Amino acid sequence: MPVLALTFLLGELPLLLSACCAPQGATGLGTVWFVNDFAQYEAAMRQGSEQQGWLVRDVFSPEPHGLAFMFPLYVGLGKVAALAHVPAELLERLAEVLARGLFVVALWRFCRAFASSRSAARVALLLALFGGGFELPTAAFGAVLGRAVYVGNWSYELNSLGLLFAAPHVPLAAASTLELATRSLRPGAAATPRGLMVTAGLVAATSLLHPFHVPALVGAMGLVGLVYWRTGRGTGTLLAAVVAGLAALPVLLPTVATFSLDAFWGATYTAQNLLPSPLPHELLVDVGPMLLLALLGLRRTGAGAFGLIIWLLLALIAMYLPVPYQRRLAFGAQPALAVVAANALVAVAAVLGRRRAAALRLGVAAAAASSSLLVLVGVLASSVRNAPVPVYR
């Protein structure tokens, strides 16, 4: 798949540039997206390689505190590195490549499952991977006015471009999330023992990697399953929702207990994860072209995308709940929005004349990709200058 090769190249290009062109004496370390987080993952890998258990401590705090179950992927990588006598960073780099590949494959399967046609699926894939919002024109407008304006937060909940540069647990979580949605949110989902076991494995993996958004997705599965059951479209989704909830609880409950009842971990990671969602009107800046197309295409969405719409609505509600990590609750919603937008774009283009349809597609591509291209250039430039760009710091 050409897109898979392109994403692999983009993900590795900053590392290649830093290896050949960074300032003399500097070495590449960590990730180029949310670079401040990598020290915690490195510490978890080191602790995993030095101990038999899976609990970790916060090595960056002198305060006395208990151990916690955190960052299991990186603890596991550290253990494998110790057993194989290879550097943990090498395994982490290989995990990055694998995670990005799995994410792109899962995204394509997701787009094919819910898009109205193969051409709409291709549009959805490109919008999900490279589509941004109106950040660039908004920034230009603010410069003209001479005042600071909101120009987007570029978090991976609202822009999947960052998943091509993020630490491996995030694209892995996105891959398992999209695969779970693909298997469970469509009508007529089969409820075979093997299928339910796969569902349980996917939701357990997602809960271990990125637990914040799991309740919204499982809740969407439950609501959609009830509708499908009551309208005679099978019980597969409802059974999958029950299994998913049971599989998620053993992971989610200890996580909630640790960060709600333990004073140290609660204070440490509440302060670190202050992640407010954009105000509703600011979503136009973050996902403008896709949001406008999706609103246009809601009435054109077929019955097969009903589950997708319910998940989007629940994610939209969840991301404004009064919790510190608001926008984490909408993880996975951007690809869903891209599919609805792509369906609308293809449907509208089909009823326009050839020239108008081409102009519409070109306009959407320019509007959606302009900000992503600018940030991508910034990422690559920072690899040469050894200076992380604040937009993705």
Language-model-detected regions and their locations in the chain:
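Membrane-interfacial loop-to-transmembrane alpha-helix junctions, especially the N-terminal start
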Residues: 1, 120-123, 192-195, 199, ...
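Active-site lumenal/periplasmic loops and adjacent helix-entry segments of GT-C-fold
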Residues: 11-178, 211-215, 386-392
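Membrane-helix boundary/interfacial segments in multi-pass membrane proteins
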Residues: 17, 23-37, 154-168, 254-287, ...
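Transmembrane catalytic cores of multi-pass membrane glycosyltransferases
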Residues: 37, 202, 206-303, 323-325, ...
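Membrane-interface transmembrane helices that cradle and orient dolichyl/undecaprenyl
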Residues: 172-195, 300-302
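Membrane-interface alpha helices of multi-pass inner-membrane proteins
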Residues: 181-183, 194-211, 222, 315-320
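Hydrophobic/aromatic-rich transmembrane helices and adjacent perimembrane loops
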Residues: 215-217, 325-353
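Signature aromatic-anchored transmembrane alpha helix within multi-pass, membrane-resident enzymes
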Residues: 238-249, 345-383
